[in-house]
Each structure stands twice: as C-alpha cells, then as structure tokens.
C-alpha cells in the first residue's frame, strides 16, 4: 500500500500479526522515500559522505483544506476524517529512516491545536498537525512534523546532520536541490559546501 494501511493501533497490530503468522511479505511503499531529492540524499549517505546520523528533521506541511472534500469524497466516515495527528508521519519520517537505514527505538508524539475549519469539513478532531521526537537505534534524534499548517504551496524538507557533514533539501529560484556539506579531511575549519 502507498497510504496508511490501518486506522487504529489495533488494526496495525492485526496487520503485523497476520504477516508473522502467514510468513508473507507486506510492502509499504512510502512514495516520498523514492523522490529524486530524497533518493539522492540516500545515495550520498550510503556512500559515507556525511558519516553516521546524529540529528535529523523531516517536514511535510500540506494545508489540504481546499481539496479536503475531494480527498475524503465528502464522506464523514472516510479514514482521513478520523486520523490521529501523529499517525500520518510517513512523508516526514519515512525518508529519514530510508536515508539513514536506522530504526526508531523510542517515539514521543505531540499534536498542535485543532484547526476549526476542518471541523466544518468533516474531520472529527479538527485535523491538527503532529510532531514526533524519535530516538533512532544509534542514539540519534529526529524531529518529524507534518499536517495541515497554514502555508502554500505545500512543503517537504529533510535535513540529516552526520558525524562528518550535512545533507539537506532546499529550494531557491532555480528549484529544489540537495545541499551537501563535508568537513575537510585535513582541516576541520575548511569544508566543502555545495549543491548537488
């Protein structure tokens, strides 16, 4: 699946148990992991350009109020109308996990205040945005933020700080790019800082 396969933790547990019992493979194809910029970040990270991750950020901001009735088909029972703010972290957190190859071992979630407009559009909880602070299996910390915060156009942003440098997405007049910073092997104050 490309979107959330479960609406509740109970459904998520049921999916995991079914996979374990049957021995089948379940593939969750989080599409933001395979976009050009995040794929390039993955490639450079795997080549060791910035060392091991020490801190990272993933951001997916999409104020979808204008298209809400279209994507929920106006159905008050549609899964999006009952989604907890921290459940849709796939676009913000998925690429960070894919880029670094590290797994979360501890997660603390927060939600921002509900958005009044979304109550009128059918969302039972006001479609608040979610934030997660995640500890990875190597001890690194990740901040993930996602949801319907007010801004246009929608934005995704990824930053990975490593033991030897930095990789991050950025946008300028020429479009979106990946920024790479690498410490010099001979002098820590001299560095390579470029767009790739």
Language-model-derived ranges and their functions:
Residues 102-109, 141-143, 166-170:
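Acidic/polar loop patches that form or flank catalytic/metal-binding clefts of enzymes
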Residues 31, 136, 159, 164-196:
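C-terminal glycine/acidic-rich active-site capping loop/insertion
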Residues 24-25, 32-125:
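Predominantly a Rossmann-like dinucleotide-binding segment in NAD(P)-dependent oxidoreductases
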Residues 1, 26-28, 57, 144, ...:
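Hydrophobic residues in well-ordered beta-strands that form the structural core
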Residues 125-127, 132-139, 160-163:
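Active-site beta-strand termini and strand-to-loop segments that position acidic
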Residues 1-33, 48:
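Beta-strand-loop-alpha-helix segment that lines the small-molecule cofactor/substrate pocket
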Residues 90, 145-153:
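Glycine-rich phosphate/pyrophosphate-binding beta-alpha loops
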């Amino acid at each position: 699946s490309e979107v959330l396969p479960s609406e509740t933790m109970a459904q998520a547990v049921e999916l995991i148990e079914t996979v374990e019992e049957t021995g089948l493979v379940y593939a969750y194809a989080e599409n933001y992991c395979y976009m050009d910029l995040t794929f390039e970040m993955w490639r450079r990270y795997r080549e060791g350009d910035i060392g091991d991750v020490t801190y990272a950020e993933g951001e997916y901001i999409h104020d979808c109020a204008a298209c809400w009735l279209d994507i929920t088909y106006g159905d008050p029972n549609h899964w999006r109308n009952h989604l907890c703010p921290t459940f849709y972290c796939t676009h913000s957190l998925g690429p960070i996990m894919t880029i670094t190859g590290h797994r979360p071992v501890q997660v603390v979630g927060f939600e921002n205040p509900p958005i009044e407009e979304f109550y009128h559009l059918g969302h039972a909880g006001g479609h608040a945005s979610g934030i997660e602070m995640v500890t990875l299996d190597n001890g690194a910390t990740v901040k993930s933020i996602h949801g319907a915060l007010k801004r246009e156009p929608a934005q995704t942003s990824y930053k990975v700080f490593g033991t030897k440098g930095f990789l991050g997405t950025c946008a300028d007049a020429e479009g979106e790019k990946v920024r790479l910073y690498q410490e010099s092997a001979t002098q820590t104050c001299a560095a390579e800082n470029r767009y790739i």
